[in-house]
Amino acid sequence: MNQFAQCRAMHQYYRDIFTRTIYLPEADVMPSHLVAEILHFWSTDYAAMEPAIMAAPVPPELEAEKALAIKHLLCAATLANQAFDSKKQGHQIAAAEGFGEQVTAHVVEALKRDDAVNLVVAAIQLLFRVGEIDGAVFLISNHLSRLSNSAPVLKILLLICLMEEDYNQAQVVIQTLTSDFALIEEESLVLLMIVCGIYKLGGCPDSFIDFRPLNEPLPLPDYSRYTWHIPKAATDNTTVLVSCDPNYFFEHAQALVASVYDTNGTALDVHLHIYNCDARCEARVREMQAAFPGLNFSLSSEVIAPVRGINVHYASRRFVFLRYALEQFDAPVMLLDADCLVRKPWADVHTRLDDADLILTCSDGAPLWERVLGGFIYARPTQANFRYLDIVARFIDRNLAAENNEWFLDQVALSFALDTLPAVEQMQIRREEA
């Protein structure tokens, strides 16, 4: 690993998830309201908190250097709270110049006074949260023997290894985590990292998420589950495919259809695939047909029983239907998230994309299970595309049947199915930055 470019580029969500909880019992010597504001309520008011922290009284028997170490670490935490994804409403906003260095300076001042394990772990978490990956890895390397049972550090290290594709080091971390399940703490993201790492190392996990469908020629899903309410008229137009439940249909999909009509007129068809579609949904679709004259509508549905992880079913089953729709329509299909809007004529966009047969979206700095994003796919009905989508559909269908209703299942399928394609077919896929 060098420079940690991928870790620096990854979404703040991933730098937050293993750094939200800071275990620092040493801070109990500080006024409880200050500690709570910083470590539990994630105060970002450094201007107010820093002087309060530094002036806070501590027990007289506590060594002055140890007290100062705790104070510097709390100052670092107050600064690092500014990096939380929740503080930026999910937007990726670059930190102010010198921000990382300021956090690092407090960490250095803390650890040169007291390098107790809890302080080192907290320091690693704070540096990782603000994107100071070099500093975090430096501390891990220097204190490795003392951190072998630290769950937060092992999880952070595994994420760094996977992001930077250092699978040799990842294997060591995976072995450590899986040797003591208490370290994993049943966190779904940790289990996701482990199974993805094992697959990249040549294994084939069959629990949590079952990777066997990537390599086994299983039968295709049972497409007889689909019910047609409004048949698809045969056209050569690209069909916009929108799959959602009734709530999302009424909250979002109607606006999406309106944006398709506003920007593309009747040049695109629209197919709505509504999970647990009821009479109210069908009636509304027929009203939309009248409201958008000339727009070719079609409607299908499937029944999904209430289950744990129903949102995973909603997100994933659309890719199973995509494979079926591509063959049934015998025309290009563009899958879109129901809560997006179309802003430009598709013909202009597709020309700019070299009239590609398969267009996938990606994101710089995405982890390996998000190499392909699920919000947009364009596919023509070619044999190469059928092969790819067959694998995706089998993977999703088998995992949902096994109740592996894990978040990111759809993107795991889309991302790892690419690895099974011949190199020449992979090279022909157009990848666009989301």
Where are these regions (language model features)?
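Short beta-strand/loop segment that forms part of the nucleotide-sugar
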Residues: D269-C277
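Non-catalytic N-terminal targeting/anchoring module and adjacent flexible stem/linker
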Residues: M1-Y223
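Catalytic core and acceptor-binding pocket of nucleotide-sugar-dependent glycosyltransferases
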Residues: N385-A434
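Short, acidic, metal-binding catalytic loop of nucleotide-sugar glycosyltransferases
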Residues: S259-A267
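N-proximal low-complexity "stem/linker" segments adjacent to membrane-targeting elements
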Residues: F208-N247, E251
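GT-A fold catalytic core of metal-dependent nucleotide-sugar glycosyltransferases
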Residues: Y314-R371, I377-A379
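Active-site-proximal specificity loops/subdomain of glycosyltransferases
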Residues: R280-Q328
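Short, charged/polar "capping" segments at the starts of alpha-helices
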Residues: M49, F249-F250, C277-V285
